Structures are given as C-alpha cells and as structure tokens.
C-alpha cells in the first residue's frame, strides 16, 4: 500500500471497527496517516485495535456503543469530537445478518434488532456526523452494505431489506449533504477475516461467485481508501460492488 490514498491529518470514525472488515479498514486508514476513533459493543476489543493503531504511530480513540440503540449515538459522536475535534471520514460498518427461519416465523424482536443495527443506527449517525461535516470542512461517509441487498434470499430477508434501505439512504444523504460531504456505499460479498473462521469450506469457496472464491481483506480496504480519500472527489451517491461477481 502506497501513499496514493494519503489520509494525513484526517480523522476516521469506524463502527464495528474492532474485528472483521471494520478492523481491516481501521488498520488501512492508520497506515495512510489517519487517526482513528473505534467503536464496537466491547471496549476491550476496541482497546486492542486501538493499541495496534498507536503502534503504527497514529492516535486512536475508543467508545463502547451499540449502534442499534439510537440513544447511544449522540454520546458516541460527542466522544469522537471531544477526542479529535472533528470527523473527516465516517464508516458505517457495524452490522449483523442472523438467519430467519421463515418470514412468518421471524420474531418481531429479531426483525427490529436487524433493522435497528443495519438501517436505523446508520441513519442517525449520518444525520449527526453529516450535519457537522457540512457545517465544517466537509468529509466522506462510507456505508457498508451487502451483496444480500442486491441478491436477497428468504433466509436473510430482514437483513437484505435493511441493507437495501441503507443503499437508498446513501443517495438521499449525498444530495442532502452535498457538495461538501460525499456519501457512498460499498457492497461486499464474502470475505475471509476473523469472522470467517466459523465458516465451512463450501461457504469459503463461494462457488456461486464469478471469481469462485471469497475475498481477501486487502481487496476491500482499497475500495474504502479510495472513497475516503480525495481521489474520489467526484464520486458520491454511488454503490461500489466488491463481491467477486456474486450471482
């Protein structure tokens, strides 16, 4: 990774930044010179990721937060701005895709949890951070969606619907907060991270994708770096598929 996507002097707020693709993006942003504010539900996991960022010579802040809880998000944003004075890059990465037995057997509690984490929380965070970005020097918001929103299956219907709604929000907020704030979506397929260790071999092979494999972490962080950096200065309201050609 070179300094082509230089983020020196920038501050990135990454939800779900202590593991999986969020953790990979945290490290990539720091490697390009950004300071990072990391949030997830477990402060210990956030601190572990923050220690790695600091070892790279960058500053890191942490905050334990459940993005699904609207009331907690004001505190998260206040903590990030108190730590760094600004947020230049917001990555709405936190998400969950539990399987539902069937539409008729999906419990309301499960449905509400999925929608809150994958749609309602990002809506609130974009509102809070985007308005501050627009009042300041601008910035970049990156929403992490899912190939499931484009290729929905019955077992993930609530999740697919929530992510499809997130895709729509990307376009809406791009217009609301433009021209100073760019808002884009990355739509990932299956990626081999610490989360994938529980997958069986068939799932890892991803035979239904055109590339016949799951992605490597570095294959999504480059997309995130592009959207976070000035190299994407004429890109907003867009959805970037990084899914290996999933069918």
Describe each PLM feature range.
Residues 126, 162, 170:
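Active-site helix of classical SDR
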Residues 18-19:
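Conserved glycine-rich cofactor-binding loop
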Residues 84, 216-242:
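C-terminal substrate-recognition "lid" of short-chain dehydrogenase/reductases
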Residues 43-44, 64-76, 108, 218:
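The beta1-alpha1 cofactor-binding region of Rossmann-like NAD(H)/NADP(H)-dependent oxidoreductases
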Residues 101-103, 107-115, 205:
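Substrate-binding pocket helix/loop in short-chain dehydrogenase/reductase
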Residues 146:
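Residue(s) in the substrate-gating loop at a strand-loop-helix junction
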Residues 131, 174-179, 233:
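Alpha-helical segment proximal to the catalytic Tyr-Lys
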């Amino acid at each position: 990774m070179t300094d082509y996507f230089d983020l020196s002097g920038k501050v990135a707020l990454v939800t779900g930044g202590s593991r999986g693709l969020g953790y990979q993006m945290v490290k990539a942003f720091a490697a390009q010179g950004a300071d990072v504010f990391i949030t997830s539900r477990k402060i210990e996991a956030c601190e572990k990721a923050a220690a790695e960022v600091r070892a790279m010579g960058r500053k890191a802040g942490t905050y334990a937060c459940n993005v699904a809880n609207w009331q907690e998000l004001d505190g998260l944003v206040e903590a990030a701005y108190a730590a760094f004075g600004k947020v230049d890059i917001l990555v709405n990465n936190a998400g969950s895709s539990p399987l539902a037995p069937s539409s008729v057997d999906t419990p309301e509690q499960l449905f509400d949890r999925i929608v809150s984490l994958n749609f309602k929380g990002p809506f609130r965070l974009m509102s809070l951070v985007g308005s501050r970005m627009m009042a300041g020097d601008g910035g970049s918001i990156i929403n992490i969606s899912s190939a499931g929103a484009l290729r929905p299956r019955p077992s993930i219907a609530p999740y697919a619907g929530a992510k499809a709604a997130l895709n729509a929000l990307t376009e809406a907020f791009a217009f609301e907060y433009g021209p100073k704030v760019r808002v884009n979506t990355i739509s990932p397929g299956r990626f081999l991270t610490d989360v994938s260790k529980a997958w069986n071999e068939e799932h890892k092979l991803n035979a239904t994708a055109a590339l016949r494999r799951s992605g490597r972490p570095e294959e999504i962080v480059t997309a995130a770096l592009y959207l976070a950096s000035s190299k994407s200065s004429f890109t907003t309201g867009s959805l970037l598929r990084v899914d290996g050609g999933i069918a």
